[in-house]
């Protein structure tokens, strides 16, 4: 994955996602973090970039949909950032 894309994703995450998901955690539902094992267990579609993008776009439960708040480039960037953090156990 492109380093610039991940850097952009980190910025989008800090400005939009960190309020609930700081450090890959979940301040609303403690078990449903952004860590690898939790994503594999709870995210419909598992730990895939497409499943993360779908969740960001459409939301689910307490998580709002971001498709009307972020543009496609920001969603692509933040999804890649979350995926990279989870797959490589960086949270």
From Swiss-Prot:
Positions contributing to heme c binding: 17, 20-21, 63
Post-translational modification: Binds 1 heme c group covalently per subunit.
Record keywords: Chloroplast, Electron transport, Heme, Iron, Metal-binding, Photosynthesis, Plastid, Thylakoid, Transport
One Gene Ontology CC term in the entry: chloroplast thylakoid lumen
Protein's UniProt keywords contain Transport: yes
Subcellular location: Plastid, Chloroplast thylakoid lumen
Gene3D superfamilies recorded: Cytochrome c-like domain (1.10.760.10)
Major location category of this protein: plastid
Superkingdom of the source species: Eukaryota
Function, in words: Functions as an electron carrier between membrane-bound cytochrome b6-f and photosystem I in oxygenic photosynthesis.
PANTHER family reported for this sequence: CYTOCHROME C6, CHLOROPLASTIC
Record's subunit section: Monomer.
Similarity comment: family membership: Belongs to the cytochrome c family. PetJ subfamily.
Protein name per the record: Cytochrome c6
């Amino acid at each position: 994955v492109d380093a610039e894309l991940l850097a952009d994703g980190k910025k989008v995450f800090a400005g939009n996602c960190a309020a609930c998901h700081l450090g890959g955690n979940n301040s609303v539902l403690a078990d449903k973090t952004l860590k690898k094992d939790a994503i594999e267990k709870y995210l419909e579609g598992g730990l895939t970039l497409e499943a993360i993008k779908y969740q960001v776009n459409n939301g689910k439960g307490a998580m709002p949909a971001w498709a009307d708040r972020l543009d496609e480039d920001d969603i692509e960037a933040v999804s890649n950032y979350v995926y990279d953090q989870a797959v490589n156990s960086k949270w």
